[in-house]
Amino acid sequence: MKEIEKLKEEYPLLNKLIEIEEVFWVNPNMEKYETAIKDSPLSEENVKDAEERLKRFASYIAKVFPETKDTGGIIESPLVKIPSMKQSLEKNYEQPILGELLLKCDSHLPISGSIKARGGIYEVLKHAEQLALQQGMLTEEDDYSILDSDTCREFFATYSIAVGSTGNLGLSIGIMSAKLGFNVTVHMSADAKQWKKDLLRSKGVNVIEYEADYSKAVEEGRRQADADPSCYFVDDENSHDLFLGYAVAASRLQKQLEELEIIVDEEHPLFVYLPCGVGGGPGGVAFGLKLLYKDNVHCFFAEPTHSPCMLIGLMTGLHDKIAVQDIGIDNVTDADGLAVGRPSGFVGKTMEPFLSGNYTVSDEELYRLLKELADTENIYLEPSALAGMIGPVKVCKEDAYLQEQQLMEKMKKGTHIVWGTGGSMVPEDVMNGYYKTGEALTILEK
């Protein structure tokens, strides 16, 4: 790796990141959609294939998770307007937000209450389908609810699934795998919240805890799975299937925008703000949105000031060859879902030509935003899920991107969507603690 001093000279923004200051970065490598898609390792066909597979599984999902009955076994979340929160942001940050503000409530996705219910559940279902098809227990024309049988569960019990996680991915993989009958092990990093470990154990999942961070948990999980031919490892750092499971969100969002009569075209730009850990969730969603809206959607990743792994990887072009610890950042944050020191090289390289930019936000800010959203809209998210909330303020304040893309005149007709990545599963006492922290920090700031 280039010497750190050389990197700092080449990329002066690194100095601010090292000082744990909030930064806003416009991606100089973004290309027009038609150019970017030519070199992409994934295509629209891949996303459609994932969408079809989820439809095949819908009857099974509706049967085993009654909370999805109303949506016919499709795991989806509400898209809501948050005008009171918008007013509050404008007042607190003394910055007008041009365009409408909405929240995509993946925090309230059924089954596991976070964005990870998309990719995590999809990858487990795909693996189960492959095994069942090979075994002759299933054809693609069948009603997949037949998988809810003792015979199928006994068959899946001869296989195991493993994953490394800071929490939310572990929840979705663990809950789904256990429901199908797999033996499942979740390797949890030091920052994983206790309640997430307890919940998994209550579902019969084997949880292994590490003193080290996320990358170590993944590495250990991978090593143990390699030693067991019947074990399937869900690789959050490199998985195309996870990525495609997230990408399916885009066509669902498109329908919701149409229902709300919100237009997205050249005159009506769409801005989407996505909390980013290792990169799979935000990368997949942003990729899916780009396929649909091309140059009319502008996606920004949001990371904690203590864990800006994707930003450092993208800015230096080193991707997974650099970790935040290499430049003296500690990767210790209360935004547990985003506490990742080394980004996914696959996601970074795939998204580099599509992504508009990236910014960082402090833990203190996340807590204040958590309290504010609860007060104004009565919606409770976990700290990491608030990373996107400050995005519209930053984009409007640091207007270099808007000028460069000639968007200033169009902003009034634009739409901002903050991706609320998790929160509905948080126990009440834990959420009260988060709220109180936000309250104390708000008083301090004033």
UniProtKB/Swiss-Prot annotation:
GO BP terms: namely: D-serine catabolic process; isoleucine biosynthetic process
Question: What reaction(s) does this enzyme catalyze?
Answer: D-serine = pyruvate + NH4(+)
CDD domains from the xrefs? D-Ser-dehyd
Keywords in alphabetical order, please.
Answer: Lyase, Pyridoxal phosphate
N6-(pyridoxal phosphate)lysine: residues bearing it: 116
Q: Which InterPro entries match?
A: D_Ser_am_lyase, Ser/Thr_Dehydratase, Ser/Thr_deHydtase_PyrdxlP-BS, TrpB-like_PALP, TrpB-like_PALP_sf
| The protein's Enzyme Commission number | 4.3.1.18
What family, per the record?
Belongs to the serine/threonine dehydratase family. DsdA subfamily.
Protein known as: Probable D-serine dehydratase
Q: Which organism is it from?
A: Bacillus anthracis
Cite the source lineage. Bacteria, Bacillati, Bacillota, Bacilli, Bacillales
Gene name, please?
dsdA
